[in-house]
Amino acid sequence: NFFIFLSYIFRFSKKLQLIKLENKKTVRRFKTPKERLKKRSLTKNNSDYDFPSIELLELPEKIEGIDLENKKNAETNTNLLANVLSDFKISGEITDVKQGPIVTLFELTPAPGTLSSSVIRLAEDIARSMSAISTRISTIVGRDALGIEIPNKHRETVYLREILDSKFFRETNDKLPLALGKDIFGKPVIVDLAKMPHLLVAGTTGSGKSVGINAMLLSLLYVLPPDECKLILIDPKMLELSVYQDIPHLLTEVVTDPQKAVSALKWTVKEMESRYKMMQHLGVREIEAFNDKVKKLIDSGEVIFKEIQVGYDPETGKPIMEKKALDLETFPKIIVVVDELADLMITSGREIEGAIQRLSQMARAAGIHLIVATQRPSVDVITGTIKSNFPTRISYKVVNKINSRTIIEKEGAEQLLGQGDLLITMFGEERLIRVHGPFVKTEEVQSVVDHLKKQGEPEYLNSVTIEEEDSQNISLGLNEGGDELYNQAVAIVCREKKASTSFIQRHLQIGYNRAARIIERMESEGIVSPANHVGRREVLVGKDN
């Protein structure tokens, strides 16, 4: 009996070890969606920042039987399409059928001598003959075939959660990943805004354009903390982007006034120029190299000086130059989103076009990117100047072929299905890619926004939306209200015993250049010391002085 008891104990302990081992394997194998998304930020110094959980987004709803019914419908349509093509005297063979979440692609290999244009122009007639909502026909690049896209009988809803939780998004190396949706084969489509480097979006009412912009913003907010990504949101319609008010990523409140929108774009141009000057001082060409060098300089304690003119020699008349230590700080990416360009072009067309042109031509290397959207992709809104500087463009459903050609240079956007169905032309690629955008509920956006607000308050810069003439009056920070502002800065520095450009910028909500001039004046008046070898300054006077 004793040996039987021992054997029982041995078998039980062995079984217990196997259970523990299996549990450990299970823990390793299955990570929470939140952990998988956080994996992208493990190398970043954001220990205090809590990234949004994937649980804030809704799970995809799967309806049983839809795939099977769509498959049967595709088989029926294959025979029907062959008969319809024959009726229109188009010779060829349907060589492949690929079913996607929204449409099914029928690959047609036309007979020798058949012109592609003769098939493409029959798109509307083929749709009518097959009782389809619409049909899109295009050439397949690199192959002797045409793609005929016919909507499925039952349309599958694409959810943002399944895109963000996909392997494609979690393992991407993109710096600014945008989740666009799924292609016609059901594969997630992730693009990098940093490579575009700017994006032009068009689509009529009900096309899914605004929902698509929300999906793009959320995909950025899920992986980028406020110290690495700043947003300027311009929403003249006052409806679409106001939900993001007061998230810590914002540089200024959501801009709804057209004149303030002009000021915000002009401020962005000045910020771009300021960044280029700083990069020139460090001898680098782009923001990633600048940030890497700044981190190395701070770690090593090395100081970089710049020469500034402080006056003229009374005898020779030559300028007197002095060396000043640079305040070294890394630059976050800045993304400017304009939700309705048409409204701004009506009120301030020339100023808006000039600012957008300047930014789209030069801002990429400074880490500044644009997402510009409009409901009216006409030539008076999307001018040749604007379009030529946006090589990457997205078109949701538009009214007619003219609008389609205006935005993507080709016809086809007028045949889209709406509700997130889009065509994208990428920089450096000739072919159009059809994507089905994800559906994002207002409640999902609000849940993510509420979470972000708990992570901290935004540090708004009033100078972003300040009027141009007011900016000129107070740019020196030395006259009228400028003296009062300077006195406030001195009081804060003496009270807190801290002095830096960024410290003044945060507390007074002013721009970098203006804060830098205030610090320089404090140094010249003996209130703060020159920057030491690590760029820090000592406050030389007390609060009682």
What positions do the PLM features span?
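Short, charged, solvent-exposed linker or helix-capping segments at domain edges/interfaces
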Residues: 158-162, 202-203, 446-450
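P-loop NTPase catalytic phosphate-binding loop
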Residues: 11, 46-52, 140-149, 167-299, ...
